Amino acid sequence: MKLISIIFFSSLASFAHAQVSLDEARSLVGNSSVMVLDIREPEEHATGVAKGMKLIPMSTLESRLNELPKNPNSRVLLICNTQNRSSAVAKELRSRGFTNVEYVRGGMSEWAKRGWTMESPAKP
């Protein structure tokens, strides 16, 4: 819950964090050397997800940090609906020692606007 509070209050923080274009993120989905992490909530995932992205809702991220790469230098891309939450989570993960975290500009709302393939999330 602490992580959620920190992220909520810093969600409008500076966007000076490392960011990546939607096109680049799309090209990296499925690349085994990059984790592309969709941090939207389950009700947002229900609208469609991109195949190959790991789904960890922001509300559960703190309890699921063990699912992130063990190497803190591994590349992690974060995507949410627009980029507000993903930029805040990137900042928080960097403060926890992850050195190669970027957020995706535009988010999944822009992904959908471009008509890129989305599918129903896997059943838990």
Regions picked out by a protein language model, each given a short descriptive name:
Residues 37:
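Active-site flanking residues adjacent to catalytic metal/cofactor-binding acidic residues
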Residues 8-9, 13:
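Hydrophobic helical h-region of N-terminal Sec-dependent signal peptides
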Residues 2-4, 15-34, 42-75, 84-124:
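Rhodanese-like catalytic fold shared by cysteine-dependent sulfurtransferases
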Residues 78-80:
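Metallo-beta-lactamase
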